[in-house]
Amino acid sequence: MPHIATMNTELKSRWNELVDAREEFFVELNKFSDNQFHSQPTDGWSAAQVVEHVLGAETGTLGYMKKKSSSGWDVLDKTSEENIERSKAVNARLASPEKYAAPSILNEPTNQYSKSQMILQWNLLRTDMEKFLNEIDETHYDKLVFRQPVAGMLNVLQTVEFMHHHLRHHIPQLRRIASNIS
């Protein structure tokens, strides 16, 4: 997927980090055969369930941002110091090696979709997300557009940064799964 040329530098940088994180995620994901992809360790998710979880989270995030901004960006609240601190805290939490339960707002992954199905769906989602982000006027980057279950409301810059940290958080999980099934 090409990097974006139309976003301002700050959002473009965060988007590119998210794109790069997905490439790193795919490096780990491609180490799984089709059978291994669905093999579920006794103590956790399969690689398929991790992908389904991340895809569900990103799908929900984009859907929330679209709905929240559908009445216009001017009516949205601006980012406060509290929003900044809470965003930093959730990203620090995701950067830690600790395991956390997925928020209850997300469905439990089913382990039934193929790798190719999910990658295709993820590619379509990322294209849609890129289009959405490109259409945001940079004067609205400080508007609160997404409610993250732990951090609360985030602006678009914080949301893309959160998705980046969320995706990176699951890369070691793929490595653990691979070591448990090999």
Segments the model singles out, each with a brief description of its role:
Residues 6-44:
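An N-terminal domain-cap segment
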Residues 1, 26-35, 96-104, 139-146:
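Short alpha-helical hairpin
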Residues 19, 26, 130, 175-178:
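Class I S-adenosyl-L-methionine
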Residues 1-13, 60-120, 182:
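Short, helix-capping/interhelical loops that line the mouth of catalytic, cofactor-
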